[in-house]
A protein has these predicted regions:
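Hydrophobic residues within well-ordered alpha-helices
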Residues: 87-89
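A bilobed periplasmic-binding-protein/Venus flytrap-type ligand-binding module shared by bacterial periplasmic
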Residues: 13-25, 126-143, 157
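Secondary-structure end/capping motifs
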Residues: 140-177
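Short acidic active-site motifs
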Residues: 83-84, 102
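Second-shell loop/turn segments in exported
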Residues: 45-49, 135, 155-159
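Short gly/pro-enriched beta-turn/loop segments at secondary-structure junctions
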Residues: 124-125, 166
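Short, glycine-/small- and polar/acidic-enriched structural segments
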Residues: 1-77, 93-104, 111-124
Length: 177
């Protein structure tokens, strides 16, 4: 079993649909439901980063809230996040749920549009956590505590405006985006 001592982030994901669907007039979940009803022979395929992910949960919750059965009305497929935009552009998927930078890439390249933000679907949802196995946490309690403390110190450092330029310089390097 895995245990978590710390939430690392909340919210931060978006549901992106292809610019082609947008050009067809799909601007809302209601529009998407109507498009599905008008084209019963077409499978609308949507990508997510993993079947055991918040992205899957968000997609399913959002679709179901709009009267779309995620198991019957659309096809859900797992795609690694760095491949989302290319698959959207190629027409392999109609949309996806992911975090940045992939959403920004889709929007900035004109390939996709934001249909929904996770903040609007499930406000305050946990996104990333520090997870360790229970066995490890019990075997190394001081190391576990030191890890949590180090992460909290790093958070404080990143949150300090005096360190803003340095932090931005680090996280905006090409290998991280």
């Amino acid at each position: 079993p895995v245990c978590s001592a710390m939430t690392l982030s909340r919210n931060g994901n978006s549901i992106i649909f292809s610019k082609d669907l947008y050009k067809e007039g799909i601007r809302t979940l209601e529009d998407f439901k109507a498009a599905i009803a008008k084209t019963p022979d077409k499978v609308h395929t949507l990508g997510m980063v993993h079947s055991a992910s918040m992205h899957n949960l968000l997609f399913r919750y959002w679709l179901a809230a709009g009267g779309i059965d995620p198991d019957l009305d659309v096809g859900l497929t797992v795609i690694p996040p760095p491949q989302m935009v290319a698959n959207l552009k190629a027409g392999n998927i109609d949309g996806y749920c992911s975090g940045d930078p992939w959403n920004s890439h889709a929007v900035n390249s004109g390939t996709g549009v934001v249909m929904a933000r996770s903040l609007d679907i499930l406000p305050g949802h946990i996104e990333k956590v520090l997870g360790v196995t229970e066995d490890w946490a019990q075997k190394y309690p001081q190391t576990h505590l030191a890890l949590v403390k180090a992460l909290l110190e790093a958070c404080d450092y990143c949150d300090d405006r005096r360190n803003r330029e340095e932090v931005l310089g680090l996280i905006s390097q090409e290998q991280y985006i």
